[in-house]
UniProtKB/Swiss-Prot annotation:
GO biological process, one term: protein-containing complex assembly
Protein name: Mitochondrial inner membrane m-AAA protease component YTA12
Chain positions covered by the region annotation Disordered: 43-67, 115-173, 806-825
Ranges annotated as biased composition (Pro residues): 154-168
Gene Ontology terms: cellular component: cytoplasm; m-AAA complex; mitochondrial inner boundary membrane; mitochondrial inner membrane; mitochondrion
Subcellular location: Mitochondrion inner membrane
Activity regulation as described: ATP hydrolysis is coordinated within m-AAA protease ring complexes: ATP-binding to YTA12/RCA1 inhibits ATP hydrolysis by the neighboring subunit YTA10/AFG3, leading to coordinated ATP hydrolysis within the AAA ATPase ring.
Record HAMAP family: FtsH (MF_01458)
């Protein structure tokens, strides 16, 4: 059989020579390999017949080439295949292939003769053993195919398809979708439905009257079967079955209340119908179990249990547990930082918080060189809490620590310890610190630790926080208990350090409290330098970072990153070649006031009111000594509700005097007072101004001690959710009167100022109606310079006319440098 298959391959190769139109193609190489396998088979067949004594075999062996000749042909084929693969075809390749084909054809003829003789010999032996008729019928299909193959080229039959893997084979894709529970449930439902359908088809309920009049009176009843003392089956006799109304039915049934009542009624009915006692209807009593009905009764319970198991597994997987069950929930979800694949952030990428960065870098130094400190008797700090407003760089510092620590770094969110299952949070804390100890020295960073570190409450009878408190207790024990985590540093980040538990903040757990505030001027310069480095700028980074840092007081690091990104987007939207100063100014306005709502069209009357409103703010800010410098006035709607805005530039001030607060309140009331002076009725546009004024006046009275009647007492509310007041009703009345007095004084002062500067208000309002936007330069042209020196040093240093003109010229120079040169052709 093996030699026969080889002969078919050889015949196919010889009868169908390779098309050399695609000489270097894969088809040609496959054909050569087929011929090469033919040589191997021929040599094996030849070596197997070497020791035979039969004369015909010996004669045939003489016709077959010797081993040396076969080996020579083999080497020719190997050389030919190698040349084809390496694309080194000789010039006489046609002649070379012709010789190889002739050699293969000669070998094929010899093998065909040998195989034919072998089959004839086997046929003779079978004829001698079984007779000619049986031997003739036992001729194999292979022999007939072999004999017919000498005259025509018949392709071999296709190989049988591979067997399909069983359903329980893991390699079978169907098995992956098979769920035993689904199969069982489907089978049960189908069985129940089939049983129910069969019951409905076979049964038909009737009443007692129908049984008596239509069946019993007409003699169609063969017997009665009382099932489970509640139902009676009326079995029909042959006469009843053959009736047209009962065709295809074997029985009817009706229900009974009790057996005694049924027997009494049956006896009475038979007496009334004069049925002879020898022909009375026999009654049988049986107990039957309806498995489908029983299964249907327990089906809701089974489905409920299965649903609970399914939901448990799904929630376990969604919560990060392993697929093995809910026991995987106890594993920590902390992720180990990979310095090769994760975001690569170094300490040089962190700016604006130099003091905090030094503290964190010292932790890294502790872990890298512990002997340097231990030889002095110092112990490595256990942990540090990073606190501060959002966007100041707490998480960024942790990322930089992971990038430069050189030790295993694990980071996890505080909310990942909170689960719906009891004990999961504490188990995850144990697993986290166990992993950290095994890989010590290491660093663990817990972001938003206030999710599990809130202060424990006294008298908590509801039990709502028991699970969170258990997680916190486990955290306290792991950080500084009987098994301290030596050489494991814990860093944590939070925006609310005031609500954390005192036991968590004590030395020995979090030894250092690092507060990261919003950056000052120098910090903003450094942050802008980091972000501007990645942008294509039209000006110099040094000049831009100074001006932008002065324009963004109170901005956090995240706000500055957003400004740089928005400026790049605006430049790309405008098809500019580089990011310019005006793009950054637009981005700052977008971050402060929101996007311009150009589609929000104001009526002429509303636009006029907004213009006078903003003109009142601008004039008050221009002539009040302690007001912040005015940068821009606009009546273009921005954000959700602002119909206009005045942009001021406060400095990095840490102390506010009473006069400064009153000047700010007076400036905030300038819009409403301007409406009162120029229109017969006021509008609702000053609602936000009133909130600011009331808040400042209340703080002056209740917190800052700037009221003579209240004095030096702090009545600040402990919490916004606290419904009680820290003062009496009489004190509350005094506070209200003092707040009103301060606001009224500011209002009277603002009214007096705007009446004196009525021409300036009119002038600014008219220009605003025409241009919609006024800059500081426009204000100087209209009103002259401010009568007071600016109290913001950064304003004078980086926002003066000289610096502005310097940046503009630098941008123009770069534009000319980047312009395409005219063609000389």
């Amino acid at each position: 059989m093996l030699l026969l298959s080889w002969s078919r391959i050889a015949t196919k190769v010889v009868r169908r020579p390779v098309r050399f139109r695609s000489y270097y193609g894969l088809t040609h190489i496959k054909s050569l390999h087929t011929q090469y396998r033919l040589l191997n088979r021929l040599q094996e067949n030849k070596s197997g017949n070497k020791n035979e004594d039969n004369n015909e075999d010996a004669k045939l062996n003489k016709e077959i080439p010797t081993d040396e000749e076969v080996e020579a042909i083999r080497k020719q084929v190997e050389k030919y295949i190698e040349q084809t693969k390496n694309n080194t075809i000789p010039a006489n390749w046609k002649e070379q292939k012709r010789k190889i084909d002739e050699s293969i054809r000669r070998l094929e003829d010899a093998v065909l003769k040998q195989e034919s003789n072998r089959i004839q010999e086997e046929r003779k032996e079978k004829e001698e053993e079984n007779g000619p008729s049986k031997a003739k019928s036992n001729r194999t299909k292979e022999q007939g195919y072999f004999e017919g193959n000498n005259s025509r080229n018949i392709p071999p039959p296709p190989p049988p398809p591979p067997p399909k893997p069983p359903l329980n084979d893991p390699s079978n894709p169907v098995s992956k979708n098979v769920n035993l529970f689904q199969i069982g449930l489907t089978f049960f439902l189908l069985s129940f439905l089939l049983d129910l359908l069969n019951s409905l088809e076979e049964q038909s309920e009737i009443t007692w009257q129908d049984f008596r009049e239509k069946l019993l009176a007409k003699g169609y009843v063969a017997k009665l079967i009382v099932v489970n003392k509640s139902m009676v089956k009326v079995m029909l006799n042959d006469n009843g079955k053959n009736q047209a109304d009962n065709y295809g039915r074997n029985f009817y049934y009706f229900t009974i209340g009790s057996i005694d009542s049924f027997e009494h009624k049956l006896q009475k009915a038979q007496d009334e119908l004069d049925i002879d006692k020898d022909f009375r209807i026999p009654v049988l009593y049986v107990q039957e179990g309806n498995w489908a009905k029983a299964m249907f009764q327990i089906l809701p319970t089974v489905l409920m249990i299965a649903g609970i198991i399914w939901l448990t597994r799904r929630s376990a997987q969604a919560a990060g547990g392993s697929r093995g069950g809910i026991f995987g929930l106890s594993r920590s979800k902390a992720k180990k930082f990979n310095t090769e694949t994760d975001v690569k952030i170094k300490f040089k990428d962190v700016a604006g918080c130099d003091e905090a960065k030094e503290e964190i870098m010292e932790f890294v130094s502790f872990l890298k060189e512990p002997s340097r400190y231990e030889k002095m008797g110092a112990k490595i700090p256990r942990g540090a809490i990073l606190s501060g407003p959002p966007g100041t760089g707490k998480t960024l510092l942790a990322k930089a620590t992971a990038g430069e620590a050189g030790v295993p770094f694990y980071f996890v969110s505080g909310s990942e310890f909170v689960e719906m299952f009891v004990g999961v949070g504490a188990a995850r804390v144990r697993d986290l610190f166990k992993t950290a100890r095994e890989n010590a020295p290491s660093i663990v960073f817990i972001d938003e630790i206030d999710a599990i570190g809130k202060a424990r409450q006294k008298g908590n009878f509801s039990g709502a926080n028991d699970e969170r408190e258990n997680t916190l207790n486990q955290m306290l024990v792991e950080m500084d208990g009987f098994t301290p985590a030596d050489h494991v540093v814990v860093l944590a980040g939070t925006n609310r350090p005031d609500i954390l538990d005192k036991a968590l903040l004590r030395p020995g757990r979090f030894d250092r409290h690092i507060n990261i505030d919003k950056p000052e001027l120098e910090g903003r310069k450094a942050i802008f330098a980091v972000h501007l480095h990645h942008l294509k700028l039209a000006g110099e980074i040094f000049d831009l970072k100074n001006r932008l840092a002065a324009l963004t007081p109170g901005f956090s690091g995240a706000d500055i990153a957003n400004v740089c990104n928005e400026a790049a987007l605006i430049a790309a939207r405008s098809d500019e070649d580089a990011v310019k100063l005006n793009h950054f100014e637009q981005a700052i306005e977008r971050v402060i006031g929101g996007v311009e709502r150009k589609s929000k069209l104001l009526s002429p009357e509303e636009k006029k009111v907004v213009a006078y409103h903003e003109a009142g703010h601008a004039v008050c800010g221009w002539y009040l000594k302690y007001a912040d410098p005015l940068l821009k006035v606009s009546i273009i709607p921005r954000g959700q509700g602002a119909l206009g805005y005045a942009q001021y530039l406060p400095g990095d001030i840490f102390l506010l005097t009473e006069q400064q607060l009153k000047d700010r309140m007076t400036m905030s009331l300038g819009g409403r007072v301007s409406e009162e002076l120029h229109f017969p009725s006021v509008t609702s546009g000053a609602s936000d101004d009133f909130k600011k004024v009331t808040s400042m006046a209340t703080a002056m009275v209740t917190e800052l001690g700037m009221s003579d009647k209240i004095g030096w007492v702090n009545y600040q509310k402990r919490d916004d959710s606290d419904l009680t007041k820290p003062f009496s009703d009489e004190t509350g009345d005094i506070i209200d009167s003092e707040v009103y007095r301060i606001v009224q004084e500011c209002h009277d002062r603002c009214t007096k100022l705007l009446k004196e500067k009525a021409e300036d208000v009119e002038k600014i309002a008219q220009v605003l109606l025409k241009k919609e936007v006024l800059t500081r330069e426009d204000m100087i042209d209209l009103l002259g310079k401010r009568p007071f020196p600016e109290r913001n040093d950064a304003f004078d240093k980086y926002l003066n006319d000289y610096e502005t003109e310097k940046i503009r010229k630098e941008e123009e120079k770069n534009e000319k440098r980047n312009e395409p040169k005219p063609s000389t052709n």
